[in-house]
Every structure is written in structure tokens, then in C-alpha cells.
A protein has these predicted regions:
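Secretory targeting and sorting signals
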Residues: 1-31, 60, 193
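Gly/Pro-rich cap/lid or specificity-loop segments adjacent to the active site
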Residues: 32-305, 360-362, 366-505
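Short loop/turn hinge sites at secondary-structure boundaries
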Residues: 158, 317, 326-337, 345, ...
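Flexible "cap/lid" loop of the alpha/beta hydrolase fold
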Residues: 237-255, 324-327, 335-348
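Structural motif
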Residues: 293-309, 315-319, 348-356
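Short, mixed-charge aromatic SLiMs
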Residues: 330-343, 348-349, 383-391, 497-501
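Long, low-complexity segments enriched in small/aliphatic residues
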Residues: 332-366, 370-374
Length: 505
């Protein structure tokens, strides 16, 4: 996953982060000594949004290394919004994806579930190890995503070497985080979830995962299948492809989706005046990108920032208007400030926590190719088919070439013992291509898949599509899934939310 704007995914419910509180817990690891958790000491949250929602906050203390539970400890930031019904359906843990996304504010997510179905759960938001308000939080080089960086496409040997040096420098800087880097695998976070279950005094958990959070759910439910009561996985990672192949697949999908976006911009040429066909808009976009390499907009928005801004159009429909306005404002009026605002919103210059955790997890979940020649050959081959995102995505992952922590082996995902799961995906999702959801459906025989043909939005459940959200509500309320159909296709179909219509049209 690359630069998912978690803030945008949940903007409809205005979640946010810090907390106040204290204390402890931690538990059993898979094939590791037992660690008995203590209850979390709940207190007041620092976040106004969490306080307004009636949330409590605290810290969960867990082993740095579950193989040595008596050793060093780290603390996970946790929030809770309690059930308001007479009968509780237990706890619902939520992860927004990333890896590296903060989930602390997501204890308010239950309020977005229709039919009051979320009210019978205790919703648990948490920052995974190394993330956000958890302690310690990873950071390697806060200025890594500063403005006007070297161009992504390495069309000269010098540019290629510049990016390889930048990536190696970042990985080297990450070594200062010490032993935490050796314990940032998805399996570590799955064990943290098991610690959280025990600290909350629950025999089972319910789980809601988005994007990378689906993979965390897959790993947890493979390691602890009897501990899963109900599970919703929205936009599924294909566990066969973690993580090198998954990123190459993303490149092809994002190129398809940006063309869909350019077609939409052209449809409203009377509003934006950027071209009357998708091809014309695309040509103009690449022309502007080349010119920004020589004269960055406002001195800050160069070709990389330009790419990063519009990457969000491949993730979600609901930012399309703002991006088109900024595109048009720059082309026709030289107004660069809306571009900078969009970039800052997605990438938060001066804060590399998300990126540090992203690499710490993905670089150690599995072994990446150690030979740069393979990366070069594979990425150039994909670039010639899909130029929009390929080299940006490649450089986002190249710290894995020299990551200062050992890689492990990915878990073989097996959902045969899991009681049930609701899978959701839009069929043109670029960040987690739809084949991943089909594969997970195969691996979880008791699951059902809701598909949205033609939809391009990533992680879109509980965002206002009544067809999807009502089925989520029914599952959470009763445990009933859409009837599973023969074969390996979707079990239920919903229309995606319609494309936005510009106000001026």
C-alpha cells in the first residue's frame, strides 16, 4: 500500500488522535512463553473528537519481543467507546490500514454503522506498535518528504543513483530506532491484538480492517481462529503477493484509475477547461509535470509532488473535484497554493512516522529481492505499460533493499477455522486489486464477498453507500452473511456511489 490518505478515508466521521491515560497489559504469543495481561487503566482522551464521542483512552503495555515476554516493553495507545445497548456484542477492534495508519480515533466508527447496529459493541481504536501516539513511535528522517525532490522517473544513471542513495540513507537512519525494528512484523501486531483481547477480558474479538488492516486480520485469524467472532475486511490484500508483487500490481491498477479520472475531468470540460477528451487531459497532465521539473510551482511543487497529489484520484472519487479545481487553477491562473494544500493534506511534510512504519513492517514481513537489477528490470517493464505511478511506488519501497532489520517469512493464510467474515471491495480498487478479495474468499470458506462493479474507491464501506452499509449493519447485528454463491465470484452486488458532479456544471 502506498500513501493511503487515512484522514480522507474517515473524513465523514471526523476522527482524530492524541490521548491521555496510563497503564498496562500484554499476553501470549504464538509458540512463545505466556504473558499475562493487566487491565488497561482508562482515563480521559486528549482528542476533543474522542471526548465528544464519550471515548476513554489508555495505554496497553506489551512485550517488545514476544519471545522474551519478561524483557523490554512498549506501549500501545488505545481508545474505547462503550456499547450503549442493554446487551453487549463484545469488543470491535479497528485498523485503518497502511501499514502505519493511526487507528486511535477509530473507536468512533461505530456511529457510522446504520440501523444502530454499532451501538451494541465496544469499539476499540488503537495505534499499532510504532505508530502515532504509541510509545516509542518510529521516525527516521522527518524531512524525507520535503518539497521539490528528485524526479521519480530515473531516466539518467545519475537520477537512479540519487534515489538509491536516498533510499539507503533513509534505511540507515532508521537503525537509530534500535531493537523495535526487529519486531515490527504483521505477526507482532497480531500478537498485540491478542494481548489487547486478554487485557479487555474477552474470550473473542470482533474486527474491522481496511486495506492493510485486512492483511492484519488475515494473519490474526490464521494464528487465533477461535478468537474471531465476526470480522469485516474491506479492500483485501492478496496474501500470495506480499509485498513486492503486490506493489507492481498496484502500478497497473493506478494507471487504469487515473485514466478513469482524466475521462471524468474531460466530461466536465465546460467547468475545468483542461481538455474535451481523457487523452487530452492526460497529455496536459504529463506536460505540466515535465514543466514543473524545471520550474516548481511556488518553488515547492515539482514533478514528484504533482504525482503524489493526483495519486489520491486513483484511490478515491470523493476528492476528484478539489484536484480538478487545483489542476485548472494552476494551468489557467498559476495558482499553486491549492496544489500545496492538497499535497500537505496527503503527505504531511515533516512527519515520516507513517512511512517509517510502512517500511518497518513490509521490509520485514517477507524477503524482498536483494538484487537491484531485478527491481530495475521489473519496474521499467511495468512503467512502459503504466507510467503514472510505477517509479514513485518503486522508490517508496526501495528502503527495503538495505533495511537494517532481518526479514521473516509471511504467514500462510488459512481461514478454514474462522466462523465467518464479510469481505467488501470495489472491483476497480487500485490499492488492493479485486483479485485479492477473490483469493481471500477462497481461503475463508465461511466468508461472503460484496462487490461493487465499476467502483474505483478504496476502503469505502461506512461511507454512505446504503447497499453496502446496510449489509454491514445486518452482519454486525445478527451474524448473518449474504448467501454464498457457487464458484469464486462475488456473493452480493452493490452499485458504487456515483461520480461527483461539479457544482458549477
Amino acid at each position: 500500500m502506498k500513501r493511503t490518505n487515512v484522514k480522507k478515508v474517515f473524513s465523514a466521521i471526523a476522527v482524530a488522535g492524541l490521548l491521555a491515560g496510563t497503564v498496562a497489559a500484554a499476553p501470549v504469543a504464538v509458540a512463545a512463553p505466556e504473558f499475562t495481561p493487566a487491565p488497561i487503566a482508562w482515563g480521559s482522551c486528549n482528542s476533543p473528537n474522542l471526548r465528544k464521542a464519550g471515548a476513554e483512552c489508555g495505554f496497553l503495555e506489551v512485550p517488545l519481543d514476544y519471545g522474551n515476554p519478561g524483557g523490554a516493553k512498549i506501549s500501545l495507545a488505545v481508545s474505547r467507546v462503550r456499547h450503549t445497548t442493554t446487551r453487549s456484542q463484545g469488543v470491535m477492534l479497528v485498523n485503518p490500514g497502511g501499514p502505519g495508519g493511526s487507528g486511535l480515533g477509530l473507536s468512533v466508527l461505530g456511529k457510522a454503522v446504520p440501523k444502530h447496529a454499532g451501538e451494541s459493541y465496544d469499539w476499540i481504536g488503537f495505534d499499532p506498535r510504532g505508530v502515532g501516539s504509541s510509545k516509542p513511535a518510529l521516525s527516521c528522517d522527518p524531512g524525507y518528504f520535503g518539497y521539490n525532490r528528485p524526479a521519480y522517473v530515473p531516466d539518467t544513471p545519475r537520477l537512479e543513483q540519487t534515489w538509491l542513495a536516498r533510499s539507503k540513507s533513509y534505511a540507515t537512519a532508521c537503525a537509530k530506532n534500535g531493537p523495535l525494528l526487529e519486531h515490527m512484523k504483521t505477526t507482532d501486531s497480531a500478537q498485540d491484538m491478542e494481548s489487547l483481547r486478554k487485557a479487555l477480558g474477552q474470550q473473542q474479538i470482533n474486527y474491522y480492517g481496511f486495506s492493510y488492516g485486512t492483511y492484519l486480520g488475515q494473519v490474526y485469524s490464521t494464528l487465533y481462529p477461535q478468537r474471531v467472532r465476526r470480522m469485516v475486511l474491506d479492500s483485501n490484500v492478496d496474501p500470495r503477493k506480499v509485498w513486492y508483487k503486490a506493489n507492481l500490481d498496484q502500478d497497473l491498477a493506478f494507471d487504469r484509475n487515473i485514466k478513469i479520472y482524466f475521462d471524468w475531468v474531460a466530461k466536465y470540460d465546460s467547468v475545468y477547461h483542461l481538455g474535451s477528451s481523457g487523452d487530452a487531459v492526460e497529455d496536459l497532465w504529463y506536460t505540466e509535470q515535465k514543466e514543473l521539473a524545471h520550474a516548481p510551482a511556488g518553488g515547492v511543487i515539482g514533478p514528484d509532488e504533482w504525482n503524489d497529489i493526483f495519486l489520491q484520484a486513483g484511490y478515491y472519487r470523493f476528492g476528484w473535484e478539489d484536484m480538478a479545481k487545483a489542476f485548472s487553477g494552476w494551468v489557467h491562473g498559476g495558482d499553486w497554493k491549492p496544489l500545496k494544500a492538497l499535497y500537505d493534506d496527503a503527505d504531511s511534510p515533516g512527519d515520516d512516522n507513517n512511512f517509517a512504519v510502512y517500511n518497518a513492517v513490509q521490509c520485514t514481513d517477507t524477503q524482498w529481492p536483494a538484487n537491484w537489477t531485478k527491481w530495475r528490470i521489473d519496474n521499467w517493464a511495468v512503467y512502459h505499460r503504466a507510467p503514472f505511478e510505477t517509479w514513485s511506488n518503486a522508490w517508496y519501497n526501495t528502503p527495503c533493499l538495505s533495511w537494517p532489520a532481518k526479514a521473516g517469512k509471511p504467514v500462510t493464510i488459512d481461514g478454514r477455522k474462522v466462523a465467518g467474515a464479510l469481505l467488501i471491495d470495489e472491483e476497480l480498487d487500485a490499492a488492493t486489486p479485486f483479485g485479492g478479495s477473490l483469493q481471500v474468499r477462497t481461503l475463508y470458506p465461511a466468508s461472503s464477498l460484496i462487490a461493487e462493479p465499476g467502483g474505483t474507491t478504496h476502503a469505502d464501506s461506512l461511507s454512505g453507500d446504503a447497499c453496502v452499509d446496510d449489509q454491514v449493519a445486518d452482519y454486525l447485528a445478527t451474524g448473518k452473511l449474504p448467501a454464498r454463491k457457487p464458484g469464486n465470484g462475488p456473493d452480493a452486488i452493490c452499485a458504487p456511489l456515483p461520480d461527483p458532479v461539479p457544482a458549477q456544471s
